[in-house]
Each structure stands twice: as structure tokens, then as C-alpha cells.
Amino acid sequence: MKTLVLGGYGNFGARICRALAPDAGIELWVGGRDADRATAFAQSLGAGARGVRIDAQSPDFTQGLQHLGVDLVIHTAGPFQSQDYRVPQAVAAAGAHYIDLADGRRFVCDFPAALDAAFRRAGRTAVAGASSVPALSSAVVDHLMAGWQRVMSIDICIAPAQGAPRGQATLAGVLAYCGAPIRIWQDGRWTAQPGWANPVEVQFARMQPRRGALCDIPDLELFPARYAGVQSVMFRAALEVGITQRAFAVLAFLRRKGLLRSPEKLAPLLHATGGVFDAFGSALGGMVVRIEGTDAQGAAARCAWHIAADDNHGPEIPCMAAILLARRMARGDGPPIGAHASAGLLSLSEFTPEFARWGMATDVIHEGASGANHGAPPL
């Protein structure tokens, strides 16, 4: 399958390219606006990978895809919070499959309704949000609640290592909702809380506690519809160095007071200076997903899944869902024709070999009042 990775030499695109290049079923093309960088990176991969200059925002993007004869486009060039659907629309018009790593709430949640007809006409498959959220997060929730009678609350936190490589586009994406009101499902009703404000302590299995604050992601909207009866869904991000978490809280305060209109415009400055704090952090990052509900025996239960990624390997995690889906498509085993959000398309067991490849440790801890091991089946 001829696969083009847009942003193929970027923070996430490069990781996806390294994973897919050795796959015998994939002919890899590294795409970007700089032909020299794309070609040099492709040559470093070997395995017949090629580089190509391509601009996803150009008016002849569809024609470029058709000229290359691309079967699958993997879109990694964020931030997605500010993007429209021109790229996936062009991919559908070119008759190719589509995967992206979007974490923008509106981009992912509105994706099926906006693109399903176009991809059905093309006879192709499109998946939005093939990343840590909601692809991995939904796989974890499905695993933890297997056999349960109901799930009442879902609480997710991602805690990146301070030393892990940071993409400016990712930073711009999270700054976009800093201090902005975010709609969340809490106590069985919709309410609003400001992004990146009011951090709380979050416990991890293999890391010291960190303070996490609300971020706007697709799960906050997708999960209340996906998991019948759930009363609360929360997502937080927890930065390792406390002063950086407090800095985001200050930016949130300034925006709420009308003193800072567009925090995302600070992304270049914060990206350039972020390394100053690396000496105060580590190479260890991770993620936790906690659920509460009623287990198979009718008892109150609380269960948590943890992952810890050392050696600054944390950024591999957001790439895994796209890698797994691309391999499945190359085998002819992809999701059904049409446009989908990624929730529920992958199982946690499919991620397990990828975790092992990078030496990541996972734990399932049953924290419920029942004290019994009634929750998730073992991996």
C-alpha cells in the first residue's frame, strides 16, 4: 500500500515513518513542504522509502495525490484545533484512505458527519483521532470495564516527561484552550470549566504524583455518548515541572480576565524556552485511566490502568494507533468504508506489542471498595 505521511519528518510523523518503513506491505513516502528534508529523512530510513515535496494547503493538493497514486494518507501536521476539513476532503477526492492524529475536539467529534458521505462515495476509509485520545483511551476503558454492569465515571490524565521532544504545533494546540471554557459531562449534566485552571493532584503507579489540569479533547464529548450511564468524564494533562504547570494556570487566569486573547500565539516563544526547565525534570512520562462503576458482582468498583514510558519514549504513544491502523489497512483488515472517529476501533491487546517494543510498563490496579479483582481481564 503506497502510504504518504504528511509532516513525515516532524515530531510525530518521523516516528510513524520509522515504524512503517520496514513493513513489506507498505511503500512509504515521506511528505512535507521541504523536499530536501523529506528526501534526506527518507534515505535515512532505507527500505525503499522516498521523500516528496507536497503542501497539503495548496489548491492542487488533490492532483498531487492522484499523480503519486497514493493509497493512504496519514496526516500528522497539526495543530488540528484550527484546521478545517480541506485535507481529508482532498484525500477522499483523490480516492485514498485517510488517518490523522487529531486531538482537536470539534475536528474529531464532527468528522464522521462531515466526511462520511465523501469517503463512502470514494469507497475508502477515514479515521480521525488515531492517537492517545480517543483511540488508546477508549481501548483502555473497554478493557477495564469488561464484564462490569456499568461505568459511572472516567478520569484520564496524560503526564509527559519534561525531557521528551516537544512539537510547537502540539504546544499551540493546547494553548488554544488555555483559560477558555470547556464543556464537560459532570454529575450527569453538561457544565463548563476553564482549561488549564485549578490543577489537582493525580496519582500514578510508577511516577511521583503530579498536578493535572483540564484540557479539551474529543473524549469529553465522545465518551458520554459511547458509555451509556456514565455520569462524569474528565481529562487532565500533568506537566512534570511544577513551575510550568503553574505558568499555564497563570495564562489561563489572564485569558479569563481578558488580558490575553490568544495564548496560542505564545507557542513559538514557549517552545524555544521550554528546554530551560529540562534540568528539573526527567525522561519518565506516562498516562493513567481510572474508571468507577459497578462490577460483575454488583459491587462498587474502581480500577486504573497505568503506563510508564522512560527514556523520553513517551511521544511514541500518540503514534501507535495510526501505525496499527495503517498496518491493518495494508493487510486489507481496516475499519469499514466511511468516516470514523477512532474510539473503539482498536483493542488494548493490539497496543501491547508496541508498548513492549519501547520498554514501557503497564499496570492494572483495582482500587475499588469491593477489594476484589473483579475488573479487567489480564492482558
Task: Describe the role of every protein-language-model region.
Residues G10, D34-D36:
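Helix N-cap at the beta1-alpha1 junction of Rossmann-like dinucleotide-binding domains, i.e.
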Residues L6, A146-E292, A299:
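Active-site-lining helix/loop region of Rossmann-like oxidoreductase modules
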Residues D23-L28, G32:
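A generic structural motif
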Residues T3-P22:
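N-terminal Rossmann NAD(P)H-binding glycine-rich loop of SDR-like oxidoreductase domains
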Residues P79-R183, L222:
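Glycine-/Pro-rich loop/turn segments that contact NAD(P) or position catalytic residues
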Residues L254-P378:
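C-terminal active-site/capping subdomain that shapes the small-molecule cofactor and substrate pocket
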Residues C17, V87-P88, A322:
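Generic hydrophobic/aromatic pocket-lining and core-packing "Φ" positions
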Residues E27, R37, F41-D110:
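NAD(P)H-binding glycine-rich loop region in Rossmannoid oxidoreductase-like domains
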